[in-house]
C-alpha cells in the first residue's frame, strides 16, 4: 500500500513538472500549448492527493481523524484541491477538448 501511494505521488509530481515546463516554454515565446498538460496535472494530482491522504488516515486508524495529527489536516487540504482548481469533470472536459483539436 505504501509503495503504491509513493508511486502515485511521484507520478503526479512528474505531470506537474511537465506542465510547468510547457508553460515555461510558452512564456519564452515558443508556440506551444500547455492547457492539456495543466489540466492533466490538476486532475491527477488532486485525485491522487485525496486517495493517498484517505489511505494515510486509514493507516493511522482512529488517530487519523484527530486534529492533532497532520494527516487529518492533509486530507482536508486534499479535498479542497479537488474543488478549488476546478472539478475533476471540468478538467476532463478541458483534456478532451484539447485532444480533439
Residue ranges and their predicted role:
Residues 1-101:
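Alpha-helical interface subdomain recognition
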